[in-house]
């Protein structure tokens, strides 16, 4: 497999999504992060010593540590009749990741974080889900003045 990842922030967001998804399936945080980052970069023993980018680790550990808070925020922005349990794991993971970056990464403008997670959503989900994620995160950004870092 050729390495299509370039260590850009978008690529690292995508790898963070992959790691978070694997954590939901029972993987340990560091192992999931190492696999998501290195599965197409190195083989054998070298994979054990691969240094993970700070941005990737910050996203994965941050979402993992704030999962309950993020889930509560997502739940409060769902339309009547919807619950967190009704969302697919893919959409939940994307929402958590996008919301975490919007809420906690001051150096990333909200609109950038929003647009980036939509691009990841288009790759791993369908167009309807990408629009749903865009709508929910846009609603959060518009309601929370401190979130509008753009």
UniProtKB/Swiss-Prot annotation:
BP term (GO), one: DNA-templated transcription termination
SUPFAM superfamilies: NusB-like
GO molecular function, a single term: RNA binding
InterPro entries: NusB-like_sf, NusB_fam, NusB_RsmB_TIM44
GO CC annotation: cytosol
Top-rank taxon: Bacteria
Keyword entries, A-Z: RNA-binding, Transcription, Transcription antitermination, Transcription regulation
Function: Involved in transcription antitermination. Required for transcription of ribosomal RNA (rRNA) genes. Binds specifically to the boxA antiterminator sequence of the ribosomal RNA (rrn) operons.
HAMAP family: NusB (MF_00073)
Family as reported in the entry's similarity comment: Belongs to the NusB family.
Protein name (database record): Transcription antitermination protein NusB
Native source species: Streptococcus pyogenes serotype M49 (strain NZ131)
